[in-house]
Amino acid sequence: MIFQRTELLIGSENLNKLKNSHVIVFGVGGVGGFATEALIRAGIGEISIVDFDTVDITNLNRQIIALQSTIGKLKTSVMKERLLNINPNLIVHEYPCKFSKDNIDIFFKDKEYSYIVDAIDLVTCKLDLISIAKDKNIPIISSMGTGNKLNPTMLEVNDINKTSVCPLARVIRKELKNRGIKKLKVVYSKEEPKKPENLEGSREKKVNVGSISFVPSTAGLIIASEVIKDICNL
């Protein structure tokens, strides 16, 4: 039995709750990928995964779906195959597209979710998703910035209004206030962002965000733990 060890920890009643739960994850990259896999390994029975992107060589340093063999493939397709290889009985809905306020019905019309995981990078899309979750009274947890960070022990779960240091959280906090949204559970880091180094020999004027294997992954696992605990009231 796949979930025998989990049942020993949380009990059969809670395991059944997870089996009958449907979670939708927006963004299956560095944070969302680890969150997704942890959710289904914990026993979530139905999952929807949303991501328009393909696996890139630059994802190899931190994303659970990134392998030499998956470069160039749709992230949702790679993730779906991986999840079903863990639990063949899992129900997976794949959305290889970008979420926006213009295609809300694709994800929310005639669908019910136990929880929403927001691992979106783009601020406008992030805000629109949070607004929809609040309008529909669906529990949601949002990932704040994990780039340019080195210390995973500085990550914590809190309400958006109690966050500090994180530049993304500052923007989200301000914009949610403008939208009249007072509460939002987030995972964020209290670590001051590092200034990214210039790559040797690079002529690019744009400075990309630095990242490492163990910070986004930890954020994803924290998100998964919060979802599981909330669904089971643990």
Residue ranges: model-predicted function:
Residues V31-G32:
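Hydrophobic/small residue at the entry helix of a nucleotide-binding pocket
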Residues M1-I24:
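N-terminal charged helix/coil linker that caps or initiates catalytic domains
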Residues V25-G27, V50:
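Conserved N-terminal Rossmann-fold NAD(P)-binding element of oxidoreductases
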Residues K19, K111-S114, I120-C125, D135-K136, ...:
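Glycine-rich phosphate/adenylate-binding loop
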Residues I44, I49-N87:
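Glycine-rich phosphate-binding loop and adjoining beta1-alpha1-beta2 segment
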